[in-house]
A protein has these predicted regions:
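Membrane-interface micro-motifs in multi-pass membrane enzymes
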Residues: 130-182, 210, 333-367
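Intrinsically disordered, polar/acidic, low-complexity terminal segments
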Residues: 2-77, 92-134, 377-502
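Hydrophobic alpha-helical transmembrane segments of multi-pass membrane proteins
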Residues: 101-109, 139-142, 162, 205, ...
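Transmembrane catalytic cores of multi-pass membrane glycosyltransferases
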Residues: 32-100, 158-161, 203, 207-350, ...
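Alpha-helical transmembrane segments
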Residues: 13-28, 135-142, 198-201, 240-246
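Transmembrane alpha-helical segments
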Residues: 110-121, 170-182, 218-227, 297-303, ...
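Transmembrane helical hairpin unit
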Residues: 303-418
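Short hydrophobic alpha-helices at membrane interfaces in multi-pass membrane enzymes
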Residues: 180-204, 235, 239
Length: 502
């Protein structure tokens, strides 16, 4: 029986695939136990931490404290009318040992939003493939974890990861909803209204999460609206686009945004355009590496199957280069915004979401290219497919080898000097084995105990040593001098000073 119509075979493959990726990701999950708060984690969570210290898990007071934090930063620092609220709930307000929950807070939305996108696309093209969305979501999540350019800012540091990844994840889901609404004439009325309403909610939340994710969401929806309006006279994505633009404007025009941008020397418009173009081009060169080729190879067979769907006309595949062009424009726009407003390309956490956009864009381009070969150029790929079927016993080993390659080599080539690091799984295993993760956690736990000592209203702490700074867990540390992290109000001290004891 053909694999795509053999439910039992698909179930076996999915189970084995999930087991293998779970084993490969085990060091990443274990390493989260040693993650600890730093930098803005303390500043944003000062109010909620005070509530926990005084009242325990008092939900109404916690919600009020988080809302007050949100309002304060909206008016005084940045117009993120959603993320300030979520950042106030960094897990360490309940104690350092809970901070590892950051990884779960990041990965669950990412996985399920990728699943939502895959489900909207796959079940529209081939309703029989009910397990394929789970496999695609798991594969992309695995690839994102292993190749993330700045994993500490995307997986283990709460303030950095939660200020970007959840809103990027919602943008991914919104793209899936927009795709489903492209076929609104084939959807039940209730489902059309549900998808449109969900798109509006997602768009408004994204707008209050981060400006870059908000801009990406607007551009993706704008593309969907333009394509559907021209070719299908379909306007079901317009409400989500309106909500996205309203949310982004509410963010950009906030008083806090004006305060933040006034503190940076933004680049001129032409300079920002050119610099963003050059950086986007350089990223394409740097990120086209072996792990990415392994990912694209793993996607070939499922994407080839989907290109044969009768739901899509041949016209869709006429210009496969448009996939790469749209991907480049999206990357350029995401880099342009911080370049123009703040004069720089942004931190590693921004490059994380640019990289994930790049990966998904290449997957879409691969889909268009395969469809172009078969349905436009008339190149039959059935021979290659038959060869793969004859090698059915070897395919699991080949797929496992590619996953192992992705878990070892990684894609950490965004910034100069990072080429020596492994992929996230292997690097996590290395840091667990050499004890640097344990030393990092022990040092910060000792610091927390000192800061929680009520008998010491004035506290002096030391920076971390070099052997207490594992690459995957360490983002930054205090520097000798006054407290710049907000440790004083967070721990309720009269003063906190930092001394270099070495």
């Amino acid at each position: 029986m053909d694999f795509w119509h053999d439910a039992a075979a698909q179930k076996r493959w999915l189970r084995r695939f999930a087991l293998l990726t779970g084993v490969l990701l085990l060091p990443v999950l274990v390493l989260a136990v040693f993650a600890r708060p730093s930098a803005d984690d303390f500043i944003y969570a000062a109010r909620t931490h005070a509530v926990v210290q005084q009242y325990g898990l008092d939900l109404p007071r916690l919600l009020r404290a988080a809302w007050d934090t949100n309002v304060y930063y909206y008016e005084n620092w940045q117009g993120l009318y959603v993320s300030g609220f979520t950042l106030a709930f960094q897990p360490a307000i309940f104690g350092n040992k809970y901070y590892g929950a950051t990884l779960v807070c990041v990965l669950l939305p990412l996985f399920f939003c990728l699943y939502g996108l895959a489900r909207c696309v796959v079940l529209r093209l081939d309703p029989a493939q009910r397990r394929l969305p789970w496999a695609l979501a798991l594969l992309l999540t695995f690839a994102f974890i292993e190749g993330m350019p700045a994993p500490v800012e995307g997986l283990y540091w709460f303030n950095g990861a939660m200020n970007y990844l959840p809103y990027f994840s919602l943008t991914v889901l919104n793209a899936g909803l927009a795709f489903a609404l492209c076929f609104a004439d084939k959807l039940p009325t209730r489902r059309k209204f549900f998808y449109a309403a969900a798109g509006c909610v997602c768009s408004f939340v994204i707008g209050g999460g981060h400006q870059v994710a908000g801009l990406l969401n607007v551009l993706v929806l704008l593309l969907a609206v333009a394509l559907c309006a021209v070719h299908r006279r379909n306007f079901w994505q317009v409400p989500a686009l309106a909500a996205a633009m309203a949310g982004l404007l509410l963010n950009v025009l906030a008083p806090g945004t004006q305060v933040r941008t006034a503190g940076f020397a933004g680049a001129g418009f032409a300079e920002a355009v050119v610099k963003s173009f050059i950086l986007a081009a350089m990223e394409w060169i740097r990120w086209l590496d072996v792990p990415l080729l392994c990912l694209l190879a793993l996607l070939v067979l499922p994407l080839l199957h989907l290109t044969r769907s009768a739901v899509l006309s041949d016209r869709v595949f006429r210009h496969p280069w448009l996939g790469a062009a749209v991907t480049f424009v999206l990357m350029w726009a995401m880099i342009f915004l911080p370049s123009y407003t703040m004069g720089g390309i942004g931190a590693g956490r921004l490059l994380n979401v640019v990289w994930m956009t790049f990966v998904q864009g290449l997957a879409a381009t691969e889909f268009l290219l395969l469809g172009w070969l078969e349905r436009v150029r008339g190149v039959s790929l059935h021979g290659a497919e038959q060869f793969c079927r004859r090698q059915a016993r070897r395919l699991p080993l080949l797929a496992a080898a590619m996953l192992l390659c992705m878990a070892c080599i990684g894609s950490h080539t965004v910034k100069e000097g990072q080429d020596s690091y492994f992929a996230t799984s292997l690097e996590a295993a290395y840091e667990l084995a050499n004890g640097s993760a344990r030393r990092y956690a022990d040092a910060l736990d000792a610091r927390e105990a000192l800061l929680n000592d009520a008998a010491q209203p004035d506290v002096s702490i030391r920076p971390l040593n070099d052997d207490e700074r594992p690459w995957l867990l360490f983002y930054t540390d205090v520097a000798p001098g006054p407290d710049m992290w907000g440790l004083t109000p967070y721990f309720g001290k009269q003063s906190v000073t930092i001394s270099d004891f070495e």
